[in-house]
Every structure is written in C-alpha cells, then in structure tokens.
Amino acid sequence: MASSINASTTAGVVTTADTSGVLALQTAGTTAIAISASQAVTLTGAITPSQTAGIVGTTTNNNANAGSVGEVVSSSVAVGSAVSLTTAAGAFTGKTITSISLTAGDWDVFGSVGINMAATTNFTASAGGINTVADTLNSLYEEETRFSYGAGGFVPNNVFSFAFPTTRVSIASTTTYYLIGYASFTISTATAFGRITARRMR
C-alpha cells in the first residue's frame, strides 16, 4: 500500500481524485488518525463500528459534555428539604418537587419520589412521576407510579419512596420537566422529596 494519499485542497477541504474510493489504513499499521480538541468530524453517512469492539467508553469518572450523547442532567430534593403536600382535590393534582431543563434531543428521563408523613397521617393514595406542567400529575398512568390504599387508608408512620418508569422524551426545543409528588390523605401532614435524572440518548 502506498504511504501517502494524493489529494487536492480547496477551501480547506481535502478531496481525492476518486471520490468513490475508500480510505484504507494498513491492517497491521501503527498509525492512527488524530483529531485535536479544536476540530470535529462531520459524517453524513452511517457509522459502522466493529461488532465486538464498538465505540470505546470513558475509562475514568468524568461526564459527557453538554450536547453530547451520554450527557446527564439531574436535580434532587433531600428529605430534610421536602416540599409540603396538601390533600388532593382531583385525580391529577400534585406538587412540584423539583425540575430540570432539557435542550432539544432524545432523552431518557427517570427518578424517584419519596413521601414523608407525620405519625398520625392517614393515606388513601400516593403517586409520583414527571410532567411538563407544574403541580400536575401526568394523565398517562403508564408513565407514573401510583398506589391506592382503599377507603380505610393506612397510617405508615414512616418515610417511603418509589421509582417511576423510565420515559423517553424527544423534543425539538428546550423543555422543562417537573418531578411531581402526590398524596391523598386525612389528618396531620405529608411532604414529598425525590430525584429526577435525564440522560441524552441521541
């Protein structure tokens, strides 16, 4: 194989004479294509990595850059800073615990909600999930976790928490997602805390 590539340069673009060809490196060669941090590669065709080696992941405890696949956005409220809940008047009322802002893209959103109640609080139902509307549960039951304790309710006298299903969101512009907690109860008080996390998939 030749040790050089014959090409012409126009306006900073390198073009080979045969535009239908393939750039091939030696099978046992030690030379790699290096791209500096100030440069980028734009591909308009499909990327086909090795089926076994694939795309190498990070080898240390760092984070993906904003806008890159793997980016994580998260927000949490600890039990000591839990927000107060009021007895729900409707099926989809709730309380915003915290929120995150996601830029355009394809995301997986997941998290958990915790309910903290006083010793005498009597619960008949609780729920948690995400929504794009503040202080409102999502009307899609499959995107939330809900519990019903019957007409008699129960008095847990403790803190309990639960995860809600991972939800894919594909958005064309920056959107706020709220972590919502809900409780239907009588007597005494209840508060909600939790975490909402999103990871960019595309």
What is the predicted role of each segment?
Residues 24, 34, 100-101, 168-170, ...:
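Generic structural detector for well-ordered beta-strands
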Residues 24, 42, 108, 176-178:
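General beta-strand recognition
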Residues 61-98:
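Solvent-exposed, flexible loop/coil segments flanking beta-strands in beta-rich domains
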Residues 101-108, 174:
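Extended extracellular/luminal ectodomain segments enriched in beta-structured repeat modules
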Residues 13-17, 98-103:
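Short secondary-structure boundary/capping segments within folded domains
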Residues 2-48:
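Beta-strand-rich receptor-binding modules of extracellular spikes/adhesins
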Residues 86-96, 110-174, 180-192, 199-202:
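Terminal beta-strand-rich extracellular "head" domains
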Residues 51-65:
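Extracellular beta-solenoid/beta-roll
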